[in-house]
């Protein structure tokens, strides 16, 4: 049982770390988008090179924003049975009857808990894998955005 708890904690820690990185980098992504919007008049009046760089920058910014949202809001598969350790399943099952929820949770036997924990590890690992995939794509798009923002800054000086 301790091994499962350790694995569960490790997977959840990776998910938390991914979310924290996404929030930090996402704020810079949004700041870059605001910079683009503030300077749109200057960009439109500039030459063709600046406009092309701006278009590439906007595309990279939008792509990064989409990947950022996919990192923060992963889709969950709902084909698993109701879990006694997943907060949403617990809340949905006992929202109207908290006392029954407390009683039912106290009655969970070790084998049932072990199975629910293993199921949650699998589900969270799938979420972590998706987040990892989208973080890689976000970083690529964000890198293109940073490069093009730098080129825009130089061309507008």
Kindly give the residue locations of the regions a language model identified.
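Solvent-exposed, non-transmembrane helices and loops of integral membrane proteins
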Residues: 80-124
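Alpha-helical transmembrane segments and their immediate juxtamembrane boundary regions
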Residues: 9, 13-80, 136-157
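Short secondary-structure boundary micro-motifs
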Residues: 7-8, 54-55, 88-89, 110
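Short, charged/polar, low-complexity loop and linker segments
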Residues: 1-8, 44, 103-110
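A hydrophobic membrane-anchoring alpha-helix module
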Residues: 109-157
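Short amphipathic alpha-helical coupling elements at transmembrane boundaries
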Residues: 2, 6-20, 85, 119-133
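A structural signal for alpha-helical segments
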Residues: 6, 47-50, 112, 116
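Context-gated lysine
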Residues: 5, 21, 42, 81-84, ...
